[in-house]
């Protein structure tokens, strides 16, 4: 029985019916994400490895993606889109509970940390992998820009409530400090799991409070 299942898993999938090209494209992107998430620091990434994961012939990948970089861009666009949706949902939940700008910013911060810790492979593709940074395409910055823009907007709202506006409290600078610190939580806990870390939610809130200082609002 196990041999039959293994053989079925290795067997190339049937060709999608006409009109299902978009679905196949999405499946190729999902396969690429799985391959990238499992790669070691020095492991190569190829379209053939993606085709194998998707259980399709390699030429089928080229129908939708002319080369590796085009596929990598599609991967980043999807993953950043998911990040935008996840953080927006967390913010909406905080707002529904009566939270103001600080509570919404904190909710976004916490969910980003929890996602990274629960999905280290995906997180590394976005922020730590060696394959993606070799891409030199301005669209990569565009994919993730809404995340930073929203953080800046919420920080500005917090500052408006408090009336505190000093050069050292530039919203963009604070947003970058917050992002860098949250990234540190995720990266260090992924790469140094044997250390006795505080709970991720508590650590994220403590760092966010130290940077944003919402008590002044």
Model-predicted regions and their roles:
Residues 114-153, 194:
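Short secondary-structure transition hinges
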Residues 78-107, 138-141, 149, 157:
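Amphipathic alpha-helical linker/stalk segments
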